Amino acid sequence: MTSSPTRVSESSRRRSSDPITWYLATIGREPLLTPAEEIELGNQVQTMMRLTEEGDREFSDLEKKLLRIGKRSKQRMMKANLRLVVSVAKKYQGKGLELLDLIQEGSLGLERAVEKFDPTRGYKFSTYAFWWIRQSMTRAIACQSRTIRLPVHLSERLTAIRKVSLELAHKLGAMPSRQEIAEAMAIPIEELDGLLRQSLTTSSLDAPVNGDEGRSFLGD
């Protein structure tokens, strides 16, 4: 029994000294989804998205339950596909961004893919998500390559966002969503999105990222 605190302490030290290795090991334990699970979870997320898009109103008890189910389903889909994010991120190492930054950018793309995935179209989620993940990473790399000098205050805020993202990744065992980052920083999600937008050029934000819909943008 006396060895348990030691094991916890050693685990904490490994997590602090090598967060990337710890994170990769953590997501590797998350089970993959079956095609049937993708459809079920995807439908639950879409129900949640439709309800949230209806605006600020009082939800019924059933709707509140559907929102909770949808949120859990979204988290499950994201955690089950983080290995895909890491796989894509490794292909873009050495192109201007650190691996952790690539994973963070790819996780934002994954989040958008989960929110927009329509199971009724018949394609695999990983195929759909890959495009969003890659798009998010390549845009971030393109922005970095322009070597735009950001204002000091903006640079500091972006550094804080990265720090909070890593801390949440340690806590959750997954890269956090924008909502989770905003809540941890005690700022509205609109403010977080505004900071992320400012770090990109207007051209990179105004380019459509979904040819089928024709009106989805990175900053959406």
Where on the chain are the PLM-derived regions?
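Conserved alpha/beta core segments of nucleic-acid transaction machinery
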Residues: S145-T159, L196-D220
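Alpha-helical promoter-recognition and RNA polymerase-docking modules of transcription initiation factors
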Residues: V8-R149, H153-E167, K171, E180, ...
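His/Asp/Glu-rich acidic catalytic environments and adjacent acidic regulatory segments
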Residues: M1-V8
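Long, charge-dense, solvent-exposed interaction surfaces that engage phosphate-rich ligands
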Residues: S165-N210
